[in-house]
From Swiss-Prot:
Similarity field: Belongs to the adenylate kinase family.
GO biological process, one term: AMP salvage
Record-level Gene Ontology MF annotations: adenylate kinase activity; ATP binding
Superkingdom in the source lineage: Bacteria
UniProt KW ATP-binding keyword: yes
Record-linked SUPFAM superfamilies: P-loop containing nucleoside triphosphate hydrolases
Organism from which the protein derives: Neisseria animalis
Gene: adk
Compartment annotation: Cytoplasm
Pfam families: ADK, ADK_lid
Domain notes: Consists of three domains, a large central CORE domain and two small peripheral domains, NMPbind and LID, which undergo movements during catalysis. The LID domain closes over the site of phosphoryl transfer upon ATP binding. Assembling and dissambling the active center during each catalytic cycle provides an effective means to prevent ATP hydrolysis.
Gene3D superfamilies the record matches: P-loop containing nucleotide triphosphate hydrolases
Protein name: Adenylate kinase
Length: 174
C-alpha cells in the first residue's frame, strides 16, 4: 500500500539476498550458509547492497526499507551516509507467534507462491494449488532456525528501538 501510494520501491534485503542465492553468486552462496544456520549476513555486505540499491533512479523520490537496518552498525552507516528516514515503524510480535507463523510457511519454489499450514493452507496438503507440485519448507523457516534468528534479533536488532528513539537532528525520523 505505501509503495503504491507514494510511487516508491520496497527495498528488502531478504529479497536481494534470495535473488543472489538463486543466481548462485559468490555472495549468494556465502549468504545461504549463514542464513540457513540462522545467522545474519555481515553488515559490510548488507550496507554495500543497500547503498547501491538506493542510488538507483527509482529511489530518487524515496523508498521503503523492509527488514533493514537489522544492526546498530547498519543504522549508523545509514546516518553517516546522510540517508534521511521520515519514519521508523516497529511491529512488536511475541516470539511464539513469529515461530508459529514462520515455521508453518510452505513455498512453491518455481512460482514463489506461499502458503501457511494453518492460516492459508493449500487445497491438498503439501501441494501447490496451481501445479500440484510439492511445497517445501525453506531452511530458514524451520523452527530451530527461526528460534536462532530470534535470539540474534534480541541481541542485535532490538537495540535499534532505543537508537531511533534517541536520534535527534537532521537525520532523525519522526
Amino acid at each position: 500500500f505505501i509503495t503504491a501510494a507514494f510511487g516508491i520501491p520496497q527495498i528488502s534485503t531478504g529479497d536481494m539476498l534470495r535473488a543472489a542465492i538463486k543466481a548462485g553468486t559468490p555472495l549468494g552462496l556465502e549468504a545461504k550458509k549463514i542464513i540457513d544456520e540462522g545467522g545474519l549476513v555481515r553488515d559490510d555486505i548488507i550496507i554495500g547492497m543497500v547503498k547501491e540499491r538506493i542510488a538507483q533512479d527509482d529511489c530518487k523520490n524515496g523508498f521503503l526499507f523492509d527488514g533493514f537496518p537489522r544492526t546498530l552498525a547498519q543504522a549508523e552507516a545509514m546516518v553517516e551516509a546522510g540517508v534521511d528516514l521520515d519514519a521508523v515503524v516497529e511491529i512488536d510480535v511475541p516470539d511464539s507467534v513469529i515461530v508459529d507463523r514462520m515455521s508453518g510457511r510452505r513455498v512453491h519454489l518455481a512460482s514463489g507462491r506461499t502458503y501457511h499450514i494453518a492460516y492459508n493452507p493449500p487445497k491438498v496438503e503439501g501441494k501447490d494449488d496451481v501445479t500440484g507440485e510439492d511445497l517445501i519448507q525453506r531452511d530458514d523457516d524451520k523452527e530451530e532456525t527461526v528460534k536462532k534468528r530470534l535470539d540474534v534479533y534480541h541481541g542485535q536488532t532490538e537495540v535499534l528501538v532505543g537508537f531511533y528513539s534517541k536520534l535527534t537532528g537532521e537525520h532523525a525520523p519522526k
